[in-house]
Amino acid sequence: MGVTKKPDLNDPVLRAKLAKGMGHNYYGEPAWPNDLLYISPVVILGTIACNVGLAVLEPSMIGEPADPFATPLEILPEWYFFPVFQILRTVPNKLLGVLLMVLVPTGLLTVPFLENVNKFQNPFRRPVATTVFLIGTAVALWLGIGATLPIDKSLTLGLFQVDLTVK
């Protein structure tokens, strides 16, 4: 990926285009009425049609009906709580587990401030924020997948044979 040339703001042709408002939208096509009136309803109706089509073709239940007399072996939370559940499950000290849970939203709130002096929107030009995001995503996926496994295989995802028993 090459470095793009910055625009010369002293160029009279570019200044004339910017004065006409052609700097933001390169093609000069207005959002109203073309996008908002014609394209957006097509996308919305297409999404609704796909959802209805999938519901008609595969009318399955959301889950198994609840049986009040049978307790599952391991009670798992909803899928979006798997990483946090894995933190609580693997950390031996509950106070440390709660502090780690507080660090998750705190870390998410600090990501925009990592490179706030960098005004580029391209992720390739924001290497620190992009790296932190990718590492955070990998850790969240690792914790989420590990939460679905038994506790002895949860940290290694069952890929390595590790003996964690205390002797």
UniProtKB/Swiss-Prot annotation:
Main localization (coarse): plastid
GO annotation, biological process: photosynthetic electron transport chain
Transmembrane segments: 36-56, 95-115, 131-151
Membrane topology term: Multi-pass membrane protein
UniProt cross-references to Pfam families, sorted A to Z: Cytochrom_B_C
GO cellular component, one term: chloroplast thylakoid membrane
Compartments (UniProt record): Plastid, Chloroplast thylakoid membrane
Keywords: Chloroplast, Electron transport, Membrane, Photosynthesis, Plastid, Thylakoid, Transmembrane, Transmembrane helix, Transport
Record-level Gene Ontology MF annotations: electron transporter, transferring electrons within cytochrome b6/f complex of photosystem II activity; electron transporter, transferring electrons within the cyclic electron transport pathway of photosynthesis activity; oxidoreductase activity
Cited function: Component of the cytochrome b6-f complex, which mediates electron transfer between photosystem II (PSII) and photosystem I (PSI), cyclic electron flow around PSI, and state transitions.
Quaternary structure and partners: The 4 large subunits of the cytochrome b6-f complex are cytochrome b6, subunit IV (17 kDa polypeptide, petD), cytochrome f and the Rieske protein, while the 4 small subunits are petG, petL, petM and petN. The complex functions as a dimer.
Similarity remark: Belongs to the cytochrome b family. PetD subfamily.
NCBIfam families named among the record's database cross-references: cytb6_f_IV
Name this polypeptide is given: Cytochrome b6-f complex subunit 4
Source organism of this protein record: Calycanthus floridus var. glaucus
Phylogenetic lineage: Eukaryota, Viridiplantae, Streptophyta, Embryophyta, Tracheophyta
